[in-house]
């Protein structure tokens, strides 16, 4: 039997040698025709059902240590196969060989699958781990492909132990012969050729096995499993099952190609010869698993297309040659796994490793070793090492036999390499060619030297031809969507390229090798201060718990020589920003979850815990961004996002739950809110400390409140200070929320935080806005208006403060109107108002000052009456009787009311009256000592005045002299208050001088006033005077030329410039050198910062003011030094007034005097006549000088003379035009100046109402008639209008509700008049437009065709009928005496146009309710 086996072995080897020489010439048409013939002889079966082509099978690597013994087993099994293949029917073998050619037409035969099929494990054991060996129970020509079913065959029993020992001895002998015959490989390949009979027999034997593997017949599972279990143990006796009638034993290890033509399955291993060392090397390489190549895109590709490029050679020889080239040139990596519980294994990946690759202890190799060890342990002690290795090698073949159709997915950039440690990011060895150019070279890969490779693995340093790297191939089974994969390191090789391959964990994240974290981002360790070590390229991690960024940014370190330090810094900066962007993206995801959680109506306990966890992660992420790159955090507004996402929305949710009346546990919610606020307070305290440590600064050094510093700050410190300010604002907000949660109103702590934040960065408007909120909560309206204006007048304003100011001013307006109404009611109810000889006037402040109305009540004699030019003096005297606190409250209300009109620009017609009231109350307040207005409150008043001027300026006008009317009124109010303030300071300085003269200690310096001798009230007022002077120096265009002054009474109409001149005269006597002031710094000097400068730092209207630093000695008195600086600044300001282009002050006669032009007011000249004449003389001088210069310059030529004469004429015409204009202005001013004051002595007797008076006030008119003191004169045109309203609307049924009301009132008025005229009432008359009185209105139609004007003019003509003015009666004998007119008629109307016409004709006019109040009727 051994001789027979040797004969078969030699014959098979020689046969493969012949095929190797014939492989290059295997592409002839005759061979192609012969390849196509078997498909026609197989019962005319469909080609697509003959061979199943799923695409590619999976790859799997093999450990090197087990490969050698495995190859020896292969040789052992091959000998047995040849022994059984040598005996049989020759005719049947030839037919089977043709069928084998038919199988090979579909693609190259896969040597790995052939090897795997030959080496299935012999031990099955338990069913859940059994690997079935498929055998054929039917002839090849009777097998039919059945899709969707698994194929199983019955295996034969193994040979006896003696036969296997003899085969093993033959394998050892072959190894020895191989070592002796390495140099004679080519020669033996030519000489040693088997005979034709053996070739045909071997072809027949191989073809029978291949055909059975392709057709895939199914047998019973139980019997096949039992046979495999019996054959798994070597030497186990058993019955021999024969395949055919022949008594020859068939090979136990059949080859079946059920994967596809693209799987390149071979039929049998190559033969061995005694003299062919090269064939023996091919046989050894053939047994190694190798990488499979995809040769078909689909399982339905045409078989004819595949046959074009295939030579007509035996599949076994092709498989052997292909194994040879793979062993020499290719190495790959793959993975596979087994599935238990009795189910077949799926898609095991196989790969061939060369010696160098297998020597590496890669994770893939370790995985295969572990699998082999498990197989050994399952096999038991009776199984040898070879048996376990055979079982491992048979595993993929069994899988391929049991799989159905499938799809090969080729992801981009797939690498088949184990050069790295098995990680998914490992760099592949080089690109591979899946499809050759021209013909299908992949089909003939490894056949007769026709392989197509892009690179040589023996020369790895040589660059590949293509740079694109092929990704690892993954086979997707279409029968089962879930492909089981192993967990562990082998998972890295196939990181879920298709989405639902691993449905049990669709969110799987690939784990990196080593002790690193198994999650996408590392957990955050407790925040620490120490800075970690640096690696020379990236800055060290601020927190040791955070991973270094090197692995996240680059795959390999950059060479230090290729980049400059600037480029490295920029590169590190870019990488750091990428990390920060990643952190923000993670934070956005966390914030989205938190927002979704807070959007629920109720939050459970689990939701509270989840919310706390999300907030903690958010705080860590945001804090890390702030501490890593403060500039980036500022650009991304991380501070504000931190507060909004991690605190504000959660706090608002808790507050909403507290306000909900249906809340279940309000106390629990309040406790959680307080815990959240405490946590926020601790967090921001810690953040402030970390900012100082990280960016190396101290907050104490920047709490001086200076908006402009002498030394520029470092960039990081600047951003860190902004972040610190935001943290302080958050601290203040937390304190404010805590007070509201506890239902208390002690906002002192919150105010302290806001003030600290304001001192850090005064130009930011946010702290002022928060301080305004606290003022609103505590109902301090002046503070609220001040802080809102500060937030608007900041470098970065808070625009929402404008709406807040509007609401505040609207509320102030309502309160002011209520206060005014209350004052009038108190005055009207006073019992002795007439007994005091006082009379009321109805003159408004906006009326003409040259017109004075004296109203005399009919019940009083004239001797008891006096004159009055203002409002009721009762109110004036009442200001002095008020307490300082009440007066202060009234003044604040009036002040805010006036500024509300300036800000909203609504109701400006009454602004002069309100401004007069403000100035009166302010003047009285200044007289109190101590002043009820403190220094801080006075600064706020001056600041509000500055803001009013700043806010009312024209935005689009760039001219210096372009000022709006609102701006002039605001400037007039500010200057008026400033003049009262300066007037009070002048008086206090005189008092200080008198006090110093009376002091015996100061007899030596009687001429100078010491700063230390200032009275306390003066010290309170000096900061406000200094601040306003700074503003005037910064914005001279707003007050020079002086704006139009307000129409104020004499009591408060103070000339600003004259007052400043007096103040300058007294201020020159003050000695400000009591404490020396220095301009330059020194070691023993310290910077002197005034309190007003610190409080108003960052205020935009004051940014243009002089900001010169001042230094004093460290041992000096800072309070006196501050007053010395204020006096110095005021002296400089007063000197600047003298140095203006149009000077306002001048030093004449040893003192300062005002030279400012008189402001433009009604009834006053715009300037003195002398000033105008002086201006004209100066212009004449200029013209004369110009004429002299022009004659001198024009002497050079006649052309120049003519040009200059033309200019002279043009200038002369311009001067003449200006003179004419000035003459006209002077004429108007002279007329106004010559207009005498007019006094109207009004004794009301005739009352003339208009139509609206009867419609709206019929009852009041009836009361006037009942009083019997007045005569009611009704114009006939009024009666006609009432008839029209009463009768003309009767036919209009579509009239609205208001029209019907008017119609009804007009009807009642007509009935009232008719009833009264019928009764012959002596106090009721009717008057025509021509002045005819009627005692009856039975005939009330009047012809007015010749009359001019409208109905209002006719009504006014009725009033003029009672005005009989004669010049000899009202013209006085002296020019200084006023013109006195007597009036007994009063027009009663609400119509504004009619009132204006009446005033121009000197007709007294009042509305009916006001006249009733004055007349005390009803």
UniProtKB/Swiss-Prot annotation:
Look up the domain of life of the source. Answer: Eukaryota
All residue ranges annotated as the PINc domain in the record: 1245-1396
Q: Where is the composition biased (Basic residues)?
A: 278-293
Which CDD domains does this chain map to?
A: PIN_Smg6-like (cd09885)
The main location class comes to: nucleus
**Localization per Swiss-Prot or TrEMBL:** Nucleus, Nucleolus; Chromosome, Telomere; Cytoplasm, Cytosol
Comp. bias regions, Basic and acidic residues: 30-51, 64-84, 182-230, 336-347, 367-379, 387-402, 820-834
Which portions of the sequence form the region EJC-binding motif 1? 39-59
Kinase recorded as keyword: no
Instruction: List every position bearing Omega-N-methylarginine.
Output: 405, 432
Q: Which SUPFAM superfamilies match?
A: PIN domain-like (SSF88723), TPR-like (SSF48452)
Alphabetical list of Pfam families matching this protein = EST1, EST1_DNA_bind, PIN_4
Annotated region (EJC-binding motif 2), positions in chain: 132-152
Tell me how this protein assembles: May form homooligomers. Associated component of the telomerase holoenzyme complex. Interacts with TERT, independently of the telomerase RNA. Interacts with SMG1, SMG5, SMG7, UPF1, UPF2, UPF3B and the PP2A catalytic subunits. Also interacts with the exon junction complex (EJC) composed at least of CASC3, EIF4A3, MAGOH and RBM8A; required for the process of nonsense-mediated mRNA decay. Interacts with DHX34; the interaction is RNA-independent.
> What remark about domains does the record contain?
The PINc domain confers endonuclease activity and is expected to bind the catalytic metal ion.
Q: Which PANTHER family match?
A: SMG-7 SUPPRESSOR WITH MORPHOLOGICAL EFFECT ON GENITALIA PROTEIN 7, TELOMERASE-BINDING PROTEIN EST1A
Record's protein name: Telomerase-binding protein EST1A
- Naturally occurring in which organism (per UniProt): Mus musculus
Gene this chain is encoded by: Smg6
């Amino acid at each position: 039997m051994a001789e027979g086996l040797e004969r078969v072995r030699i014959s098979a080897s020689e046969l493969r040698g012949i095929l190797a020489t014939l492989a290059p010439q295997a592409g002839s048409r005759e061979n192609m025709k012969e390849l196509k013939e078997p498909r026609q002889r197989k019962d005319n079966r469909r080609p697509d059902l003959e061979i199943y082509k799923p695409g590619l099978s999976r790859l799997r690597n093999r450990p090197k240590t087990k490969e050698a013994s495995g190859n020896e087993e292969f040789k052992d099994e091959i000998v047995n196969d040849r022994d059984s293949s040598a005996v049989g029917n020759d005719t049947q073998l030839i037919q089977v060989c043709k069928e084998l050619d038919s199988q090979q037409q579909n693609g190259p035969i896969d040597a790995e699958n052939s090897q795997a099929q030959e080496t299935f494990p012999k031990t099955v054991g338990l069913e859940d781990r059994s690997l079935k060996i498929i055998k054929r129970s039917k002839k090849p020509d009777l097998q039919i492909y059945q899709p969707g079913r698994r194929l199983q065959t019955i295996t034969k029993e193994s040979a006896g132990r003696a036969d296997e020992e003899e085969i093993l001895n033959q394998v050892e002998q072959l190894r020895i012969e191989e070592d002796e015959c390495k140099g004679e490989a080519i020669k033996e390949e030519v000489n040693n050729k088997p005979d034709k009979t053996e070739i045909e027999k071997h072809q027949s034997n191989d073809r029978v096995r291949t055909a059975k593997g392709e057709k895939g017949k199914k047998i019973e599972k139980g019997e096949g499993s039992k046979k495999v279990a019996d054959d798994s143990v070597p030497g186990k006796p058993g019955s021999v099952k024969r395949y055919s009638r022949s008594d020859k034993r068939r090979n136990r290890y059949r080859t079946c190609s059920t994967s596809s033509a693209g799987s390149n399955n071979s039929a049998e291993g190559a033969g061995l010869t005694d003299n062919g060392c090269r064939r023996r090397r091919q046989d050894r390489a053939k047994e190694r698993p190798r990488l499979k190549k995809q040769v078909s895109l689909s399982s339905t590709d045409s078989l004819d297309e595949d046959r074009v490029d295939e030579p007509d050679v035996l599949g076994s020889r092709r498989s052997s040659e292909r194994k040879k080239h793979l062993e020499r040139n290719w190495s790959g990596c793959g993975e596979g796994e087994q599935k238990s519980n009795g189910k077949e294994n799926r898609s095991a990946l196989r790969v061939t490793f060369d010696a160098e690759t297998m020597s590496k202890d890669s994770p893939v190799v370790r995985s295969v070793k572990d699998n082999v060890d498990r197989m050994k342990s399952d096999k038991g002690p009776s199984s040898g090492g070879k048996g376990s290795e055979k079982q491992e090698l048979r595993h993929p073949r069994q899988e391929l036999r049991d799989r159905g159709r499938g799809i090969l997915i080729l992801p981009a950039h797939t690498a088949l390499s184990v050069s790295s440690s098995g990680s998914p990011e490992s760099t592949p060895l080089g690109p591979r060619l899946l499809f050759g150019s021209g013909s299908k070279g992949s089909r003939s890969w490894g056949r007769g030297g026709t392989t197509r490779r892009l690179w040589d693995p023996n020369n790895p340093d040589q660059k590949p031809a293509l740079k694109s790297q092929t990704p690892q191939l993954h086979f997707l089974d279409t029968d089962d969507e879930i492909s089981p994969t192993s967990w562990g390191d082998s998972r890295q090789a196939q990181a879920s390229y298709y989405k639902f391959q691993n449905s049990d964990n669709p969110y799987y994240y690939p784990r990196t090798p080593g002790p690193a974290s198994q999650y996408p981002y590392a957990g955050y360790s407790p925040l620490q201060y120490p800075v970690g070590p640096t690696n020379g390229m990236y800055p060290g991690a601020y927190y040791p718990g955070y991973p270094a960024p090197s692995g996240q940014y680059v795959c390999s370190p950059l060479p230090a020589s290729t980049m400059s330090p600037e480029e490295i810094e920029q590169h590190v900066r870019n990488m750091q920003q990428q990390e920060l962007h990643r952190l923000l993206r993670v934070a956005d995801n966390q914030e989205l979850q938190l927002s979704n959680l807070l959007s629920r109506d109720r939050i459970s306990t689990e939701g509270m815990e989840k919310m706390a966890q999300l907030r903690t992660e958010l705080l860590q992420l945001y804090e890390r961004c702030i501490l890593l790159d403060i500039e980036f955090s500022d650009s991304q507004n991380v501070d504000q996002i931190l507060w909004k996402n991690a605190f504000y929305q959660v706090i608002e949710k808790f507050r909403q739950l507290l306000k909900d009346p249906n809340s279940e546990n309000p106390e629990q919610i309040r406790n959680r809110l307080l815990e959240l606020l405490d946590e926020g307070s601790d967090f921001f305290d810690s953040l402030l400390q970390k900012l100082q440590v990280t960016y190396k600064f101290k907050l104490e050094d920047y709490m001086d409140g200076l908006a402009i510093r002498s030394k520029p700050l470092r960039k990081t410190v600047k951003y860190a200070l902004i972040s610190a300010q935001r943290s302080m604002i958050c601290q203040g907000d937390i304190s404010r929320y805590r007070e509201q949660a506890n239902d208390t109103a002690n906002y002192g702590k919150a105010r302290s935080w806001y003030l600290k934040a304001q001192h850090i960065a005064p130009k930011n408007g946010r702290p002022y806005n928060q301080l305004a909120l606290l003022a609103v909560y505590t109902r301090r309206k002046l503070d609220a208006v001040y802080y809102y204006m500060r937030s608007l007048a900041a470098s970065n304003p808070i625009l929402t403060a404008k709406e807040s100011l509007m609401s505040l001013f609207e509320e102030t307006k309502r309160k002011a109107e209520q206060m005014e109404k209350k004052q009038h009611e108190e005055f009207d109810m006073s019992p002795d108002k007439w007994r005091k000889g006082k009379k009321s006037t109805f003159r408004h402040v906006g009326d003409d000052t040259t017109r004075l109305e004296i109203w005399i009540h009919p019940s009083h004699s004239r001797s008891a009456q006096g004159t009055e030019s203002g409002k009721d003096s009762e109110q004036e005297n009442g200001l002095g009787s008020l307490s300082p606190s009440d007066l202060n409250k009234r003044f604040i209300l009036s002040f805010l009311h006036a500024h509300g009109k300036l800000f909203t620009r609504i109701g400006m017609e009454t602004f002069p009256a309100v401004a007069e009231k403000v100035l009166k109350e302010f003047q009285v307040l200044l007289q109190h000592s101590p002043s009820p207005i403190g220094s801080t409150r006075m600064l706020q008043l001056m600041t509000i005045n500055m803001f009013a001027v700043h806010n009312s300026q024209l935005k689009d006008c760039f001219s210096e002299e372009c000022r709006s009317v609102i701006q002039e009124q605001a400037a007039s109010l500010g200057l008026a208050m400033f003049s009262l303030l300066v007037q009070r300071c002048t008086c206090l300085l005189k008092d200080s001088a008198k006090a110093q003269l009376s002091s015996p200690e100061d007899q030596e310096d009687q001429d100078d006033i010491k700063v230390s001798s200032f009275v306390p009230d003066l010290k309170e007022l000096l900061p406000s005077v200094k601040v306003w002077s700074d503003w005037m120096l910064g914005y001279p265009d707003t007050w020079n030329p002086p704006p139009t002054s307000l129409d104020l009474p004499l009591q408060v109409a103070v000339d600003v410039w004259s007052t400043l001149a007096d103040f300058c005269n007294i201020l020159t006597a003050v000695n400000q050198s009591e404490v020396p002031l220095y301009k330059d710094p020194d070691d023993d000097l310290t910077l002197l910062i005034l309190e007003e400068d610190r409080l108003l730092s960052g205020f935009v209207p004051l940014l243009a003011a002089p900001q010169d630093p001042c230094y004093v000695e460290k041992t000096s008195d800072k309070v006196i030094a501050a007053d010395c600086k204020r006096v110095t600044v005021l002296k400089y300001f007063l000197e600047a007034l003298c140095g203006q282009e149009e000077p306002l002050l001048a030093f004449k006669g040893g003192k300062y005097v005002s030279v400012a032009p008189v402001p433009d007011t009604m009834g006053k000249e715009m300037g003195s006549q002398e000033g105008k004449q002086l201006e004209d003389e100066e212009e004449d001088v200029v013209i004369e000088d110009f004429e002299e210069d022009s004659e001198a310059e024009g002497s050079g030529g006649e052309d120049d003379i003519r040009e200059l004469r033309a200019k002279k004429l043009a200038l002369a015409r311009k001067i003449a035009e200006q003179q004419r204009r000035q003459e006209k202005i002077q004429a108007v001013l002279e007329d106004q100046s010559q207009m005498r004051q007019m006094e109207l002595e009004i004794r009301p007797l005739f009352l003339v109402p208009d139509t609206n008076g009867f419609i709206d006030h019929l009852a009041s008119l009836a009361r006037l008639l009942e009083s019997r003191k007045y005569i009611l004169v009704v114009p006939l045109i009024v009666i006609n209008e009432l008839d029209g309203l009463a009768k003309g609307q009767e036919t209009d049924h579509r009239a609205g509700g208001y029209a019907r009301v008017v119609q009804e009132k007009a009807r009642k008025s007509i009935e009232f008049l008719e009833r009264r005229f019928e009764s012959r009432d002596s106090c009721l008359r009717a008057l025509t437009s021509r002045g005819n009185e009627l005692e009856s209105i039975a005939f009330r139609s009047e012809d007015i065709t010749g009359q001019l004007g409208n109905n209002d003019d006719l009504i006014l003509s009725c009033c003029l009928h009672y005005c009989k003015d004669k010049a000899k009666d009202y013209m006085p004998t002296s020019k200084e005496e006023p013109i006195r007119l007597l009036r007994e008629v009063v027009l009663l109307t609400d119509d504004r146009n009619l009132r204006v016409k009446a005033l121009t004709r000197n007709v007294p006019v009042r509305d009916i309710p006001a006249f009733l109040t004055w007349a005390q009727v009803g």
